[in-house]
Amino acid sequence: MTTRLLQLTRPHYRLLSLPLQKPFNIKRQMSAANPSPFGNYLNTITKSLQQNLQTCFHFQAKEIDIIESPSQFYDLLKTKILNSQNRIFIASLYLGKSETELVDCISQALTKNPKLKVSFLLDGLRGTRELPSACSATLLSSLVAKYGSERVDCRLYKTPAYHGWKKVLVPKRFNEGLGLQHMKIYGFDNEVILSGANLSNDYFTNRQDRYYLFKSRNFSNYYFKLHQLISSFSYQIIKPMVDGSINIIWPDSNPTVEPTKNKRLFLREASQLLDGFLKSSKQSLPITAVGQFSTLVYPISQFTPLFPKYNDKSTEKRTILSLLSTITSNAISWTFTAGYFNILPDIKAKLLATPVAEANVITASPFANGFYQSKGVSSNLPGAYLYLSKKFLQDVCRYRQDHAITLREWQRGVVNKPNGWSYHAKGIWLSARDKNDANNWKPFITVIGSSNYTRRAYSLDLESNALIITRDEELRKKMKAELDNLLQYTKPVTLEDFQSDPERHVGTGVKIATSILGKKL
């Protein structure tokens, strides 16, 4: 193990030996002279974050953009790819097997710029499910065959739970239930997009998600280092022996043993490297001209499958719970959304306990669920999430919050029908009343990224998000416009709707299966 840890001199591990910088006083930066409930809350939350999560990046006005639609996201991806000079680094669950246009765009960029290097990180189970037919891995293999693994480094993460009898007996269609690489990071030189969207046609056309573009070299470097670290725990696609085939190996350069050979040792080595990354990054960057930075961004991630069971150093879950615990006044409103609504019980309890006057939960209508009218077992998933929505409403009543908390279903046509959309957005917004309009709530905090805030997100998958806290009025307007864009396709749902609408009836079998398999949803 000592020998492996000494290998940190390799380029993508040098981050672990960066000199620590003097912490920056976040409270001083964000404090306002005005002792309003909003100002007081900002002081409280920034103090809490400073104590518990000091990895922080500072942004000026216009350094964060919010993309509204799938088509805008796709156009931006292609533009950024073609304009990249030094690096492209992408982490996603999968690359759609028909996304030849995107692959051609990357190929064009590599041909145009000989200095450009591309790094891909996908999930190894989802990305190889269709083998030997076309899939994510075969598309990436074509790039490696053309440009070599020195310029195109394609990695496939496979959960360490995928070993032993599970590897042999669990069918391909269901092995994703063991755990996934679920991060969505799209980096181009000194910019990075954080999103919940994957790379396939529906995410580029009619599957609503969220997308934030961050323009910062330091922020981009952080996510590049994270990308490279998780890639070093993953398999690599190298040049195929025969044209049209695929060649996947565990590189000798990886700093850990292959998980299928020694799972316990793999977890020990991977967790030490992750812990080192989180500790080495746990300082604010030195900056000048404090007053010009009106926005703070905290990276938060969940790497539970790579940590020992009782020594999880992940930052997302504890940060979300801490954030919600600071809401002690009805001067703050919140909105929570997840397309797959299986909210972690701890988060649900925190939300229900907040003393809010107004709050919204947005989830997908059964007609906007990507599994609507799918084949096989997955056809029951919309019913499962419907059942979980009903249970949430029952909990709202139990907490006597039905006057304040509204469940809203998002629907835009019917998925898989002409002009029909599906819903995949996820996130949290905290809002304060507009100083010029007391009836108008405007966000000042949001969480953006890959997590659905489910039980599986905090136990089985790799997730990466960012918590944004801002006083920038222009950014707050953009955040409100983003939220309004989601809300315009929603309608409130009550327990009475479940009682009166026969289409909301969920069979006993689905209820039982949901209770048993809830951790996998």
From Swiss-Prot:
The active site is at H182, K184, D189. GO terms for cellular component: mitochondrion. One of its GO terms (biological process) is cardiolipin biosynthetic process. Residues 177-203, 419-457 form the PLD phosphodiesterase domain. It catalyses: a CDP-1,2-diacyl-sn-glycerol + sn-glycerol 3-phosphate = a 1,2-diacyl-sn-glycero-3-phospho-(1'-sn-glycero-3'-phosphate) + CMP + H(+). Essential for the viability of mitochondrial petite mutant. Catalyzes the committed step to the synthesis of the acidic phospholipids. The keyword Nucleotide-binding applies. SUPFAM superfamilies: Phospholipase D/nuclease. Induction: Repressed by inositol and choline. GO terms for molecular function: ATP binding; CDP-diacylglycerol-glycerol-3-phosphate 3-phosphatidyltransferase activity. Pathway: Phospholipid metabolism; phosphatidylglycerol biosynthesis; phosphatidylglycerol from CDP-diacylglycerol: step 1/2. It comes from the Eukaryota. It comes from Saccharomyces cerevisiae (strain ATCC 204508 / S288c) (Baker's yeast). It is found in: Mitochondrion. Its main location: mitochondrion. InterPro entries: PGS1, PLipase_D/transphosphatidylase. Keywords: ATP-binding, Lipid biosynthesis, Lipid metabolism, Mitochondrion, Nucleotide-binding, Phospholipid biosynthesis, Phospholipid metabolism, Repeat, Transferase. This is CDP-diacylglycerol--glycerol-3-phosphate 3-phosphatidyltransferase. SMART domains: PLDc (SM00155). The keyword S-adenosyl-L-methionine does not apply. Its EC number is 2.7.8.5.
